[in-house]
Amino acid sequence: MGVVLLPPPLSMLMLVLMLLPAASASEAEHRLFQYLFEDYNEIIRPVANVSHPVIIQFEVSMSQLVKVDEVNQIMETNLWLKQIWNDYKLKWKPSDYQGVEFMRVPAEKIWKPDIVLYNNADGDFQVDDKTKALLKYTGEVTWIPPAIFKSSCKIDVTYFPFDYQNCTMKFGSWSYDKAKIDLVLIGSSMNLKDYWESGEWAIIKAPGYKHEIKYNCCEEIYQDITYSLYIRRLPLFYTINLIIPCLLISFLTVLVFYLPSDCGEKVTLCISVLLSLTVFLLVITETIPSTSLVIPLIGEYLLFTMIFVTLSIVITVFVLNVHYRTPTTHTMPTWVKAVFLNLLPRVMFMTRPTSGEGDTPKTRTFYGAELSNLNCFSRADSKSCKEGYPCQDGTCGYCHHRRVKISNFSANLTRSSSSESVNAVLSLSALSPEIKEAIQSVKYIAENMKAQNVAKEIQDDWKYVAMVIDRIFLWVFILVCILGTAGLFLQPLMARDDT
């Protein structure tokens, strides 16, 4: 099917006919604008009777909660202020203007209520009037200007980062009292239909209230509409980046008391934990308000943990001092033995390995028998070597039996700590001076070994006392860490239940 082409004159005629309604409507709006603002004064209140107030319907719509500055205690919000009133000077008949019922005009051309934010902290108190207002043929004026407000807000950081805040926004006319402007609240709360969710704060509720206040400066009564914005901080960021690392560091503090004293790294671990906590404390000081009225919850926890670590350093130094004590420097009191070696280990379910001493009586009996045999041997009947007639090659029965006895006795004596056995040997007058000197040396070695064993036992007792002290503070710090953490972080929950 081919395309039908109209003659050029006919095409021009149809184009003119299509543009006539648009041109006619534009002409109607132009005439309407001239009619409305020919004698209009944007300074005069739009009331027929000067004693009547202008009724202003007011509503705030929250678009975005931009930021809550805890340091400067400022809340920054993006709001739409909906204001509706009736201006009797801006009425017309739609039939006179080709059915035009609505018209948008610049806001600076008409009278507007001077609604301001009373608790503004920064920036302009009034909204920008560069937006247009919507006029209806009945005289109803609707003006919804957007604005970014920075309002002052008293922020209580006691339970930071699990805190709830109540920030108020007070709107009202700055120059018109109740007799000139009557504010009417639309709805019972802030409009949150177009609210863009914040990544740090959640809005619980935002009720609005109308107040009538008489200020000291004036005799008139002024109205205001105040919105109470109840917000809750989302603690996920602070939980992951602050609280959990602090919990882990506190757990490392507990492990200090489980680390053996011989390792030599106990104090190093304590100081490393203390430095880590100091870094965390420097980090959070930039995120909380600089106020001396209250200490935030996370600050209390870090302070608690820092005291915790400091005490662990002091206790660790004391434990190391006890661990390395010797009999030459310290004498263990009786009460220390009774408490730390007998009582507390049983209470703490600690078992200490005991050294085997069951062979001591048997060994002493054996050594006594050896000495008895040696004394009997000194009174033997052989007279060749005993009576001063020594053999030439030492192969006689007396010499051979004597060498065997002395060899066996010397070998056994080195494992004995009995002074009685050695003294019995020294009393043998039949032995030669060389044998007596050897036995005297063996006696010295035995006594020295006995003294070393006693000293080692005392050192082991001091080490065990240090181990008991470590175990006591291990459980004490575990309980304090658990109870302190639970007590601190359950406070916001209990405070919320009370309210």
From Swiss-Prot:
Keyword Signal listed: yes
InterPro entries membership: Neur_chan_lig-bd, Neur_chan_lig-bd_sf, Neur_channel, Neuro-gated_channel_TM_sf, Neuro_actylchol_rec, Neurotrans-gated_channel_TM, Neurotransmitter_ion_chnl_CS, Nicotinic_acetylcholine_rcpt
Localization, UniProt: Synaptic cell membrane; Cell membrane; Endoplasmic reticulum; Golgi apparatus
PTMs per UniProt: Ubiquitinated; by STUB1/CHIP and thereafter degraded by the 26S proteosome complex.
Summary of activators and inhibitors of this protein: Activated by a myriad of ligands such as acetylcholine, cytisine, nicotine, choline and epibatidine. The heteropentamer CHRNA3:CHRNB2 activity is blocked by alpha-conotoxins ImI, ImII, PnIA, GID and MII. The heteropentamer CHRNA3:CHRNB4 activity is blocked by the alpha-conotoxin ImI and AuIB.
Record topological domains on the Cytoplasmic side: 261-262, 321-468
UniProt name for this protein: Neuronal acetylcholine receptor subunit alpha-3
